[in-house]
Amino acid sequence: MKLLKRLVSVFAIVLAVGSNAFAGDEVRIVIDEGVDGARPIAVVPFVGSAPEDISKIVADDLRNSGKFNPIAVSQMPQRPTSAAEVNPEAWSNIGIDAIVIGQVVPSGNGYSITYQLIDTVGASGTPGAVLMQNSYTVTNKWLRYGAHTVSDEVFEKLTAIRGAFRTRIAYVVQKNGGSQPYEVRVADYDGYNQFIVNRSAQPIMSPAWSPDGQRLAYVSFENKKSQLVVQDLNSGARKVVASFQGHNGAPAFSPDGSRLAFASSRDGVLNIYVMGANGGTPTQLTSGAGNNTEPAWSPDGNSILFTSDRSGSPQVYRMDASGGSATAVGGRGSAQISADGKTLVMINGNNNVVKQDLTTGVSEVLSTSFLGESPSLSPNGIMIIYSSTQGLGKVLQLVSADGRFKASLPGSDGQVKFPAWSPYLTK
């Protein structure tokens, strides 16, 4: 049996900041479009009861990826509780080639979660074979985390892609009233377990994760001017790292966490700068006519994408991280490269989220929501979160990178914007 304490250490760091600042009105996923073209799978209701529905969390995770289409419980030909009870033919006859079964039982001051992933068609050699199995003991507080762990392992086994269901998102909420209506919040990727990292009477913008998941950089206007703040998620300590004359915004950590790229109008025109992650003297990268903003690093740290209106209208450019000439990439802004360096996600001229294959140059529109902004990729490149306008406010939207699955994460206590997906938070 495996105890999850070792795996939740970084999550615990994130929760430490918000332990006394729980944000009661969480954002929760509301499905907009399903995944009919995805791979069918069955997550059989786990035996036993717990405060959280483990099998539903696993099914939701797999659906959110766009790779799988979990069938309804009512469609299941049987509800086995062990591999020995599985009738492979009953499942293969309805097009299901893999099922997840399990149980959750009280254990000490928490619960034991056990699961098995079963091959129903013999792809592994024998129909009914156990593809993988595992068991965890978690406290009540970490039940959802335990379920996300099952999801990550099942997802990786079936796709050969590392799962990202134990990651988190940071975002800004502008509440409907109160003396400090602006808040930086952090939550599980699906909107649960939300906590406040910082609140202010003045606007907060553009949170960005450090690559180790232990710091957030963001823009704060709390001193009546735009400043870049880096906050440690373990201690809660905050440090102003840029407070230059003019506007300072759009921070982005380098892949090794040692540097920050950002936009500043310290010399009158908005340009891209790079400095140490703890502050210091910045190096100017862009120059000339036009405003330059929204820097984003390539995975190897050798180049930077940014948005510029130097040609008369905003579009994405790419340049060496040491400076020099820039090459137009396309789109309108908010670019990010996937961790494997193969895909570019950005906003196009119609304010839609698009992805572009950097090898072929082929682009695909993933969203048609109104005024899409700030797309952020999951660390495995499978899911994208972004903000859009609904009615008079901003909400978060989730879309799978293949465009199959779309969902909303509306906030009930204010406008939600500037989402940023965390790096992996486990080894």
From Swiss-Prot:
Signal peptide: 1-23
UniProt entry keywords in alphabetical sequence: Cell cycle, Cell division, Periplasm, Signal
GO biological process: cell division; protein import
Localization (cell): Periplasm
Recorded superkingdom: Bacteria
InterPro entries per record: 6-blade_b-propeller_TolB-like (IPR011042), PD40 (IPR011659), Tol-Pal_TolB (IPR014167), TolB_N (IPR007195)
Keyword Protease: no
GO cellular component, one term: periplasmic space
Assembly description: The Tol-Pal system is composed of five core proteins: the inner membrane proteins TolA, TolQ and TolR, the periplasmic protein TolB and the outer membrane protein Pal. They form a network linking the inner and outer membranes and the peptidoglycan layer.
Family in the record: Belongs to the TolB family.
General function of this protein: Part of the Tol-Pal system, which plays a role in outer membrane invagination during cell division and is important for maintaining outer membrane integrity.
Annotated PANTHER family: PROTEIN TOLB, PROTEIN TOLB HOMOLOG
Listed name of the protein: Tol-Pal system protein TolB
Protein encoded by which gene: tolB
